[in-house]
């Protein structure tokens, strides 16, 4: 059956919709943008501690602590900041964790396969920012309420994993850029966690990088754009001896640690 001829008004509206970009679609999920760059933007050479389990050791002489958003109290964050520390708060932005306080707000339709080695976590369908956006914004708001200086969003490389969804590189870039813009709108610093293959496309959006085991897998060169942009690159090795990676990490101007996989208080710093 032939379609009726569209009216000029209808055609105009149709053409306007054709030009709507993904950025326009995402606008409702962002607050008014904070102009300027007043959030923390670390340069290479920042001493740090990454502790996500066990009793927090607050006695370290470091510039920055990376701690769990949900498990760390506002009073503990306040204590660290009173000592002159910057506090980054860990949150997973690409996986569902069944033990989190807000686990019940994620609909089943955005939950994918379980992460390899992590039976309590499932990949998220990051193409559904209409669903995940409000949830992640509430987490960022919690970071602001607790006094975090920034966030470490984990598992933001689902497109390159067996997530259970046919995620594309472009969908991942869109989601990761959205995370960065939403964090900055709240005056939060944000780091690019792993996702090495997209560093070139994301270095201008993120304030620093955090990597696990790039020396073990011989892929640290992919992080150099951050250092070249004057941005800190934090990282850890779990299995390698410090004698096998610290010298190279220092020469690349990376801030590297040797840590236990449990990310308890134990650490050895390369510099």
Model-derived features: positions:
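Bacterial N-terminal signal peptides that target proteins for export
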Residues: 2-10
